[in-house]
Amino acid sequence: MSVSFEKKETNRGVLTFTISQEQIKPELDRVFNSVKKTINVPGFRKGHLPRPVFNQKFGEEALYQDALNNLLPNAYEAAVKEAGIEVVAQPKIDVVSMEKGQDWTISAEVVTKPEVKLGAYKDLEVSVEVSKEVTDEDVDARIERERNNLAELVLKEGPAAEGDTVVIDFVGSVDGVEFDGGKGDNFSLGLGSGQFIPGFEDQLVGHKAGETVDVVVTFPEDYQAADLAGKEAKFVTTIHEVKEKEVPALDDELAKDIDEEVETLDELKEKYRKELAEGKEAAYKDAVESAAIDLAVENAEIVELPEEMVHEEVHRSVNEFLGNMQRQGISPDMYFQITGTTQEDLHKQHEADAEARTKTNLVIEAIAKAEGFEASAEEIEAEISSLANDYNMEADRVRQLLSEDMLKHDITIKKAVEVITSTAKVK
């Protein structure tokens, strides 16, 4: 293989390489053996067309494109490796020559990894607003949340208040005409839950069971039903029941109801204190890590970040976001309809974060390279075991999904992050 790389401008160049006849000939044979099964030529059974007849009738060149498609990925990868460049975006491929009996010459316009000039990344002084301290108020708030989860709704004779639940019938109309979706019977509505249009729940506060209330609201301008957006509506609402939460007493019995592993309220408080301490410690470490990495990135200089890198990260991020929506039962079309946005809008929303992530990744990779970090066979096996445990799959399945190069990369990145964070000092 002949390989050359000509730098055209910062982070861009043309990679030229050849595919030898030793590779081309057997691939043409494979393509022909596949193609001949699909074509009909009078006088020959399908699949039994001789090669000379094919060449005479169609020309050997008819096989070239399929053969090139099959050979190109490995040839390109080998050329990149031999040229000693790091490519960060999809190349623009061009065929220079494909002469019969000659090596094929291919050119690829490539975008290369930008130079990163590192600044300080060790012994950084950072500020974080996350506290590791667990207060009595933190513990009490956790118990109160669990206590409220065990609360029961009981009928209330007095007027409805914020936090109460009302059981209602309602009929909505605009200019005296009822509309689809504006009617409900025996609907349980938590006052203050924000389930209904802004202003609806507030107008039921202070009213008792048996009362009928004319609730007047205005639909938001961006309401999903365009025919109702921005319009004033009246909901004739009848309150059947008012219910309030009745929380259990704060005692040892409550503690046992919350957690069967404890016997007393004091034991529950101690358990929660330890759990909260672990959570706050983890949050504190994450905050220090984030602040230190941000400062290391700020101290570095990236020489002309290629827009293609950012575009690819935006594309990956948007696909991940829409995939998450899909798993929640919301298709891309449904999401864009509900939000009133477009694919282009979504890409723009992700651009800033995508650029920041791209810069961060480049700086951390540069630190790993500067430190000479590598991944040993033992570390790779440990990483495989850890991933298998985290995702509840066999180690061999992890090996199938992740190449050794990917695992090595992840391990060296973790080491670089550890260098940044372990030496950081909190002001």
From Swiss-Prot:
Pfam families: FKBP_C, Trigger_C, Trigger_N. SUPFAM superfamilies: FKBP-like (SSF54534), Triger factor/SurA peptide-binding domain-like (SSF109998), Trigger factor ribosome-binding domain (SSF102735). The keyword Metal-binding does not apply. GO terms for biological process: 'de novo' cotranslational protein folding; cell division; chaperone-mediated protein folding; protein transport; protein unfolding. Its EC number is 5.2.1.8. InterPro entries: PPIase_dom_sf, PPIase_FKBP_dom, Trig_fac, Trigger_fac_C, Trigger_fac_C_sf, Trigger_fac_ribosome-bd_bac, Trigger_fac_ribosome-bd_sf, Trigger_fact/SurA_dom_sf. It is an enzyme of class 5 (isomerase). The keyword Ligase does not apply. Involved in protein export. Acts as a chaperone by maintaining the newly synthesized protein in an open conformation. Functions as a peptidyl-prolyl cis-trans isomerase. This is Trigger factor. It comes from Streptococcus gordonii (strain Challis / ATCC 35105 / BCRC 15272 / CH1 / DL1 / V288).
